[in-house]
């Protein structure tokens, strides 16, 4: 089984994607919705950036 070190999540209150260590991510937080788990930091960072770019494009 792959150890999932990182998580990308969408925070509804601030309308933005973030990443954090999986061990620190609070699954029970009301406004945070996980979208990707991985142990590949580069993938996590790229996914977060691309998702935020899409959000910005949709807001124009």
Predicted features along the sequence, with ranges:
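Short N-terminal "domain-start" leader segments
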Residues: 1-26, 60
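A short, charged, amphipathic alpha-helix used as a generic interaction element across diverse proteins
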Residues: 24-60
């Amino acid at each position: 089984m792959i150890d999932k070190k990182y998580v990308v999540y969408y925070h509804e209150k601030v309308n933005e994607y973030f990443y954090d260590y999986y061990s620190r991510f609070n699954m029970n937080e009301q406004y945070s919705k996980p979208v990707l788990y991985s142990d590949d930091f580069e993938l996590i960072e790229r996914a977060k950036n691309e998702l935020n770019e899409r959000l910005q494009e949709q807001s124009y």
